[in-house]
Amino acid sequence: MAVYTDINEIELGAFLRHYDIGTLTSYKGIAEGVENSNYLLHTSSGSFILTLYEKRTNREDLPFFLGLMQHLAKRGLECPQPVVRNDGAMIGQLAGRPAAIVTFLEGMWMRRPTVAHCEAVGEGLAHMHLAGADFPMRRRNGLTLPDWRPLWNLSRKCADTVERGLVAETEADLDFLEKNWPADLPQGVIHADLFPDNAFFLGDRLSGFIDFYFACTDILAYDVAVCLNAWCFEKDFSYNRTKGAALLRGYTSVRPLSEAEADALLVLARGAAVRFMLTRLYDWLTVPAGSFVVKKDPMEYVRRMRFHRQIESAAEYGLEMQGVAA
């Protein structure tokens, strides 16, 4: 979550007249994240999240994102729910941006996830994949293999100013991924951005997932690979195999991986690291000074890329044979 677009109380009040959520008592911007502008609203009826969709978010995708949240909730998954306006729509206009309000999800994200948190996230992710199996809408992943090289080309010229040799490293990784990216793996709705700040907990209990604005239709095991990158590396960039095993155990206890998915996991994990390095690198080089946004260091994912190059099997991530379907 982040804030790119400032709003004032007058225009917010006019926007809220289209909703039946009580009287506004306070609001504040949420600085974390990089994509859209987000505000926490407190009203006489409760707490809500207001999102203004910035230029990276295609308005045509909003029915998919908001409809997915509704669908998953109906299937029993805890996640924010879009608040319907008085005219029956879910999307309005505020400060020249498409905007929506969703319910507030109780809980906190874990800055230092434990093994128990990792297992709960893996289990929750598998439940999300199953719950989304009959979601009727589809959305192409706009940040997958065919998109990585064009994105890289936007930053390539300046990449070595961030880390000497980064151009050569990234070119080699992209060449490898283009030659080895798996085909014909099970696909469905994936979150695609399930970082610790997008999973809320009450103690060790998972209270739900948020921020579905990268959700799309893609390889299910790729979502697992994203989580291995996001949840199982320590501050010193070492991979915590115990956390990886817990996350994979949680996932496969609900949805076992096929043998093909297990074999592809090392390529998918390497690809996920490249994907997040590329978007972080682009933001690092282009987000304007003074923007109310916390930029994220692309080098965190360069170090993950280096780790994945050494992996030879999914067992090194902690995958146990009982988690693989015969």
From Swiss-Prot:
Gene3D superfamilies: 3.90.1200.10, Phosphorylase Kinase, domain 1. GO terms for biological process: threonine biosynthetic process. The keyword Transmembrane helix does not apply. Pathway: Amino-acid biosynthesis; L-threonine biosynthesis; L-threonine from L-aspartate: step 4/5. Its EC number is 2.7.1.39. Transmembrane segments: none annotated. SUPFAM superfamilies: Protein kinase-like (PK-like) (SSF56112). Keywords: Amino-acid biosynthesis, ATP-binding, Kinase, Nucleotide-binding, Threonine biosynthesis, Transferase. It is an enzyme of class 2 (transferase). InterPro entries: Aminoglycoside_PTrfase (IPR002575), Homoserine_kinase_II (IPR005280), Kinase-like_dom_sf (IPR011009), Pseudomonas-type_ThrB (IPR050249). It catalyses: L-homoserine + ATP = O-phospho-L-homoserine + ADP + H(+). The keyword ATP-binding applies. GO terms for molecular function: ATP binding; homoserine kinase activity. Belongs to the pseudomonas-type ThrB family. HAMAP family: Homoser_kinase_2. This is Homoserine kinase. It comes from Brucella abortus (strain 2308).
